[in-house]
Amino acid sequence: MVADTVHVGQHLAGHPSVHLFGHEIVLDVSIPALILSTVGAAFLLRYTLSIFRLFLELTVLPGKDIKSFQSRKGETWAVVTGCTSGIGLEFARQLAAKKFNIILVGRRQSALTDLSKEIESKYDVHTKSVTVDVSTPGSARDDALTQLELLAQNLDVGILINNVGASHSMPVAFHETERSEMSRIIETNVTWTYLVTRSILPSMVARSKQKGAPKSLVITIGSLSGRIPSPLLASYSGTKAALATWTKALAEEVKPQGVIVELVQAAFVVSNMSKIRKSSPFVPTPAPFVRSTLNSIGLPRGAQGRPHERTPFWSHAILDYVVGFAGYVSEMAGIKVILGMHKDIRKRALKKAARDEKKAE
């Protein structure tokens, strides 16, 4: 049976009425209240579904299989920058465990040699090493980029992990930051990331644009300091924000050619750069952080609504999601909390430096 046309009218008391199946139904609410209730219900539904999606992505939904980026087992290579400690070291190990050959990029040749021996003996894969100080422009860095470009042209490079990064030695006001420190941060976090990606990406595009070819993957490690402006780390925070915009633009450029480009957002992780030595639920060691990153390719988790970004580790994802939930209010609250935290860190760092200086006298 087909229902009569639904007709919304105005009842004598100013309440809306609906004609359905030949009967008039009077709603005991005013039209403005009905509109507000409908809008409120829509927002409630939206956020309920969003939270449910976050829960599913953190618990049961799988990301894209990392092995899908391999052409043939044992022949595909992954490039990992900043690979001799922390997150980069763990990326090299876990990708090798998945039978990717590894191109190791780092500053210290001795550390690269030791890591190369470890990976080849433990995981039965091949390695190559490129030694470079990424923070220093010049012929040595240019030579390293040329070397990486040639390796990408001659090997089946399917993954690039832009991990290497630099931050301030301690929180500091922007107008008091040494120029040398500022340059080191910009050259490492932005300039090198752009240049190394430019060197390797053409070969990845050529590899993946063919019909039936495996996709390629570029992962750049970002920071929630770029997501939430971080006073007293302004230079570092700005470089990480730049990487987010660059990633989104680049991802759309190369998506039709079969290359996936993602920015992975991270909060604190136990590492030399963070200067944190003890793990906690909100500060993981590199191993679980990298595992969550490789297991969630394509899933935004805490970065919902931000294309080509993801926040993979569960506690970082919840933090990112909460900050975005209330928009301006939560972001401003986050900025104030971060400023207070950085003031405290700076105060303690200056006291320690003073004690060390006194001991050295």
Swiss-Prot record:
Protein's pathway: Lipid metabolism; fatty acid biosynthesis
CDD domains linked to this entry: 17beta-HSD1_like_SDR_c
The UniProt record lists the keyword Transmembrane helix: yes
UniProt xrefs under Pfam families: adh_short
Class in the EC hierarchy, top level: oxidoreductase
Record field: transmembrane: 32-52
Gene Ontology terms: biological process: fatty acid elongation
Gene Ontology CC entries for this record: endoplasmic reticulum; endoplasmic reticulum membrane
Binding site for NADP(+): V79, D133, N163, R198, Y236, K240, V269, S271
Top-rank taxon, per record: Eukaryota
Reactions catalysed according to its record: a very-long-chain (3R)-3-hydroxyacyl-CoA + NADP(+) = a very-long-chain 3-oxoacyl-CoA + NADPH + H(+)
Entry keywords, A to Z: Endoplasmic reticulum, Fatty acid biosynthesis, Fatty acid metabolism, Lipid biosynthesis, Lipid metabolism, Membrane, NADP, Oxidoreductase, Transmembrane, Transmembrane helix
Biological function: Component of the microsomal membrane bound fatty acid elongation system, which produces the 26-carbon very long-chain fatty acids (VLCFA) from palmitate. Catalyzes the reduction of the 3-ketoacyl-CoA intermediate that is formed in each cycle of fatty acid elongation. VLCFAs serve as precursors for ceramide and sphingolipids.
Similarity comment text for this entry: Belongs to the short-chain dehydrogenases/reductases (SDR) family.
UniProt protein name: Very-long-chain 3-oxoacyl-CoA reductase
Taxonomic source organism: Cryptococcus neoformans var. neoformans serotype D (strain JEC21 / ATCC MYA-565) (Filobasidiella neoformans)
